[in-house]
Amino acid sequence: MMQQPPPASNGAATGPGQIPSDQQAYLQQQQSWMMQHQQQQQGQPPAGWNQQSAPSSGQPQQQQYGGGGSQNPGSAGEIRSLWIGDLQPWMDENYLMNVFGLTGEATAAKVIRNKQNGYSEGYGFIEFVNHATAERNLQTYNGAPMPSSEQAFRLNWAQLGAGERRQAEGPEHTVFVGDLAPDVTDHMLTETFKAVYSSVKGAKVVNDRTTGRSKGYGFVRFADESEQIRAMTEMNGQYCSSRPMRTGPAANKKPLTMQPASYQNTQGNSGESDPTNTTIFVGAVDQSVTEDDLKSVFGQFGELVHVKIPAGKRCGFVQYANRACAEQALSVLNGTQLGGQSIRLSWGRSPSNKQTQPDQAQYGGGGGYYGYPPQGYEAYGYAPPPQDPNAYYGGYAGGGYGNYQQPGGYQQQQQ
């Protein structure tokens, strides 16, 4: 069932099922941690784990994550930091450094915490000695079991600040995959498609942020558009693990070099500075795109509270359950293609913010890229869902949209 993570690309040659020698120390400690997990309660560290205390909410938290230091972020080969998600509340910098720092390859770790209460937001960053080391750890551990947890590692390249995002190596073409069996991992899904299509770049199974269990769907990324198109037909109904898959189109990512470096909102980006705001404004929405299409694309980054495309308007709003998910979605999806058109993302209006929403026309000609705030990777709180989610979508009324044949209306599996 492909339980072993892929071997390091530049390590010593190993036979089937063998572990690279430079990972032996880590895996031995992982086994020890896993034995403790049976006594672990949800949200608490395993017995004997030396957890660092959360910083006091009354004092500013010192930034520990280097984010690549003074390197020029324009070259993909120089990025040496990974984003890690789905962290449990007790997983702190000490945990990350014990996992990734045993070989001396990780130089720093940072868990993003809520400014008000000091508790983890569920994600963080790990900095490595160089790009090659970071890439090897990404390929080796992404999708592999996390020590002392039922969850798998969720890793990706760290996104840089606004105007500093690294250039992509090329366009990406994505296939939506539904009806996945509960045991399907990122690695298993990747290998299922890679056995047929050589241009597969990776796959992601979407997990519930609370339980860590699969939601029953995911996404597969291709470098070759023709293989993506073939896969949507040829892989539909094919088995991955114990169930036949259901495939369909998803958003395609264009090269990031085509995007403006920054966009300054003439009315001020109040949504970015509001720590309770979890709403993303989606501009330049194609007429064929439906709310279900937005759910399938934006839902891969976390739990959605509300999705709305106002009738007669070529824009939409996506509200997440927490700020961290919204930040990651805005960072990754801005400028990607949906329904044959590049969407433009910015922070929408918080339910508690009654200021006028910037006119959608401002976004029609090419709104720019909003990454993480220039001052660093901010920590944000959770936004309570509004009593009437449609209340702050007012002012957008008119006709409807056509029917777009995507994996819209996908029903999440009941575990």
Swiss-Prot record:
One Pfam family it belongs to: RRM_1
Domain RRM: 80-160, 173-252, 278-350
Major localisation: nucleus
Stretch list, region Disordered: 1-77, 344-369
Domain of life, per lineage: Eukaryota
Biased composition (Low complexity): 23-64
GO annotation terms (biological process): mRNA processing
Segments crossing the lipid bilayer: none
Keywords of the record: mRNA processing, Nucleus, Repeat, RNA-binding
Function summary: Heterogeneous nuclear ribonucleoprotein (hnRNP)-protein binding the poly(A) tail of mRNA and probably involved in some steps of pre-mRNA maturation.
Family, similarity comment: Belongs to the polyadenylate-binding RBP45 family.
The protein, known as: Polyadenylate-binding protein RBP45C
Organism, scientific name: Arabidopsis thaliana
